[in-house]
């Protein structure tokens, strides 16, 4: 991802990307760790919903679910570690973003795992009631 950020900085749009991304990255890097973690958990949950829905409905409905989940995480300002890697690589150095990025990775993973386990638990409960 940082390779892509480096390559984009070499293009005619690189200066504008850096100008636009700079304040966003500064806000993310100055946020508290708990805030980053909680926003990343929410994003992880949305990404789990998107993927799980598409697996169940690999058609236009699943595609719409993915589109909606991604739109919500962007509009809500949730933290997605992969998306942030690109922006961090544009305007910051690894020493400045390593810890926040690690927190986002943990938050994204936690959100997805929690929702996955909750879904499995509900399904097991339904199956045991029907048996």
List PLM regions with ranges.
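Alpha-helical transmembrane segments and their helix-helix packing motifs
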Residues: 1-131
């Amino acid at each position: 991802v940082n390779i892509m950020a480096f390559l984009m900085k070499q293009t005619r749009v690189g200066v504008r990307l850096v100008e636009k991304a700079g304040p966003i990255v500064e806000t993310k890097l100055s946020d508290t760790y708990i805030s980053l973690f909680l926003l990343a958990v929410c994003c992880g949950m949305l990404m789990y919903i998107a993927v799980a829905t598409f697996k169940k409905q690999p058609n236009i409905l699943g595609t719409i679910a993915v589109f909606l989940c991604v739109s919500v995480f962007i509009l809500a300002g949730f933290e997605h570690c992969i998306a942030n890697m690109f922006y961090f690589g544009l305007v910051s150095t690894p020493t400045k973003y390593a810890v926040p990025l690690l927190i986002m990775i943990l938050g994204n993973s936690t959100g997805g795992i929690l929702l996955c386990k909750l879904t499995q638990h509900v399904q097991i409960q339904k199956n045991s009631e029907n048996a």
